[in-house]
């Protein structure tokens, strides 16, 4: 009887020890550090973070919440080593709170320190942009415009070159035909001159 009870007690202790070890491993996973909001737009943002070296992290979980609103958005991704995540479908001029957690095989880490940020209005973004500031998108558009202009210029030059070449060819043909035309004119003029008498004298009209 005591043998059965003793075996059951040993199994119970082993099970409790396993649960305790799992909870310790999960608790030993540190919360993400240096949580930062970057590339803040009116309807999107990018959250970045760091982890302690040596933490067996296999993914992350992000909790996004509007300030003073209970509704949450939960983003989770595993089998990744990325340290950033895009937040989308945000509302302009709205405050949000973000927490980040690391995920390991044993569970999740405690949440990071909350990060509060506010999305700007589109008008504020345009006003804050200096006249000399040039974005990569604008640079790309300018490059496309320049490429289009160059293509048009090249096409026009090729067309003009073709027209000039055709004109030169026609001019050469006309110039080559001029001696033949002169010969024909001289021949025609000689045939139309005053005919000579068969005996060698010129025909004269009788008075």
From Swiss-Prot:
Site description Required for dimerization, residues in chain: 73
GO CC annotation: extracellular region; peroxisomal membrane; plasma membrane
Name assigned to this protein: Fibronectin type III domain-containing protein 5b
Subcellular location field: Cell membrane; Peroxisome membrane
GO molecular function: hormone activity
Source taxon at top rank: Eukaryota
InterPro entries (alphabetical): FN3_dom, FN3_sf, FNDC5_C, FNDC_type_III_4/5, Ig-like_fold
CDD domains attached to this UniProt entry: FN3 (cd00063)
